[in-house]
């Protein structure tokens, strides 16, 4: 079965006064129908810029997608003109933004915003589109959807707004859904409900999901495969089970080692083996990357070669890829 989404050698840069910021470099991945691929990493690793590049929402200037392809059902989005891309965006590929309060139009009711998109992509008349909007709000388990459809974003709670964003994203049954940290600003209970909701709708519509997150707990709960990014590049890719059981690159090892475990000892009596391990150092500036592996200055396993020669991203074990000279 051919992947619904195929991303090949995607590179995005920003032209700034301090130089060229290489936000995303040679990123490739694919996602099948009904599959969830998680992209994880620290703030500034390039995961959100990757998501915005898929949607062609990079502000130009200062940003620019300089190379690569993003294919949805075989159509390369990077080769489309803006009117054609506008039809794809929200139609075949949709996005749930991190903060719905800034993504939703504060001057339009929720129902009108959903209906407007349905009219654009599916060609429904106004009344049928409004009916679809109410149906989608009901679908995402918003109580009293008829009344809520007439409300403005500021009249809803954070969890309710995120549900409305999901309803809008899925109203036209897209083939690909990009979810950029969809639960970051929500409390744990609402977070779980939103993730369950995305999973339920994904199974119903067969949508391919690209989940952007820094939360490895969310990855373990929802994704089938995971891509780990660092300083704009992929450093590891594997199934979720394989990555958690057998991380190969020192960076994912460090991320997993820094996660508190339920039931672990606390206080000053913790043994060295039980202590949380931090990753020393700082993420390098993307306009001044080191010549070799970008993680080498922070890596406890780095050899001289790591500082001068960038490792290739290659197959290390069956269906398990990494970019590291030491694995």
Question: At which residue positions do the language-model features occur?
Answer:
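Conserved ABC ATPase "signature" region
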Residues: 73-76, 127-147, 256-257
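A short, proline-enriched helix->beta-strand linker immediately N-terminal to the Walker B motif
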Residues: 171-175
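P-loop NTP-binding/switch modules centered on Walker-like glycine-rich loops
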Residues: 42, 176-182, 186-268
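Short catalytic/signature loops enriched in Gly
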Residues: 143-147, 237-327
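ABC ATPase NBD coupling module
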Residues: 66, 77-94, 112, 120, ...
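Conserved ABC ATPase signature
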Residues: 151-156, 160
